[in-house]
């Protein structure tokens, strides 16, 4: 509602425009990150949670012959190499007027 001044909401307006970050593509294709988040300590939990999506994991394996967990772990490792940690997720900040900041926002 911050950009819709004629819309009345029961919620408070944010202090300013909220920055937007795009997440890495599934296989890292055509994605140039601006920010990385070290996920080394969380890698096992993230993979465990990912494998809870049985319908997607099984479908990708049966339909495309893709081990989904192995694929994302590989891209996380690659992104980790790029920023000097074991595993990382990559993001790209949306660079538009009023969305920039002078401080780091991601963990």
Where are these regions (language model features)?
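Metal-dependent de-N-acetylase/amidase catalytic core
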Residues: 1-107
